[in-house]
Amino acid sequence: EVTLAPLPEYLSEGSRFTLEAGDEKGGLRSLRVSIEQAGRETTVVEKTFPYQGLFNSDGVHRHEAAFEIDPLVLNLAQGRAELKVELFDHSRRGGGDGNRTLFTHNLTVDTIPPAIRALTRLHYINQGGSCLVVYQTSSDTEKSGVLVDRMLFPGFSSGGKASPGSHVCYFAVPHDAAVKTPVLLWAEDRAGNETRTPFYHRV
């Protein structure tokens, strides 16, 4: 029995996982967590459990663990990967190696943030006023817009098939905002990678 959480679709940064493994009959013999990509397998967690007592009555029958997978630390490439949990019990079957339980989960490694840049050049904004910016995003962008301090003004696609990735955004600056209030273009992809970049404007 193996339970692993969470089960993300994407891996963009260091993520913490919790694992529960159990075998009520023979008890646990070994546990291994690994991530495989293009034939290259990297071990994340590996643990063995000794046979103790009559019929392993004093052995480990349930184990909980927490671990982190960081794609940068493990030098994972961009693209598909398979997260694997392999478990053996103390059964005499399988030539004495025990019964094997294999749990797998497919995910995509994506650590590259989306690209975004302004197409319009001059953006003059009065305090309490609004402005329009036209900008371009990369194809992996899911959400985008303008951040005025902590307020997000969402952008909308404007290019259609002729100019994919082109967006417009109407944004406003509060009347009591400081002259140096940060105004940034913002984009996020499916994996949760974010880009925040300045563009020419004057409040």
What are these language model-derived features?
Residues 7-30, 64, 125-139:
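Contiguous beta-strand segments within globular domains
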